[in-house]
Amino acid sequence: MRTPHLARLIAAIGIAIVIVIGVALTSGGRPMITANEPPTTRPTVRFQGLPPTTTVTLTPRPTSLSLDGVNPCTILSSSQRADLSLDSSPTPYTDAEFDKAKACSIRGLESGTVARLALVLNMGADVWLSDEAQVQTQTVTADGFPAIVVRTPGLTDACNVEVDTSDNEFLDVLFRDGGNTPPIPQDTLCLGAQRVAEAAVSSLKLRH
């Protein structure tokens, strides 16, 4: 049976995408979405028919990067945001759907992309490698730290990277298409999420 924490985390990914879109539409007075307007109700995400990933494990962390007390909107520097084509001001919010995790949305006006960083402080990133999660995963690294690329069934316009930063903590990076025509391929979005994760870890390492 799927644990309550895991079920809420999976649901939070779909809900976070709606929140990120809403922030992009309202924070600067300029519509970010030119197509695929967000639904008025929460999306239903189904998890069926994907292979289990229980045999995959994360590599050891080189050190620990505690996220407790970190402001997610200050993780990426202005120069890093420029390099990632995220040219708007970071917008903080609290993910009320998942234990009030601190999160930050940053959009790219020219690139038509949106990035979201969220700090999960009550479980480890390896929760995504459980077959209970029923998502498509690929283990990677982010500036030397173990990470997982997560593709959620039914959500092709976004990609997540979960960085194993410390025991029972991880950095969740969401990178999504902001309504481009044609839409950005998910493979490209996953590469974008990895770039954001790399930059975020690089910045966090300077704080420790």
Locations of regions flagged by a protein language model:
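Sec/Tat-exported extracytoplasmic proteins
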Residues: 77, 85-88, 108, 200-204, ...
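Short cysteine clusters
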Residues: 73, 104, 190
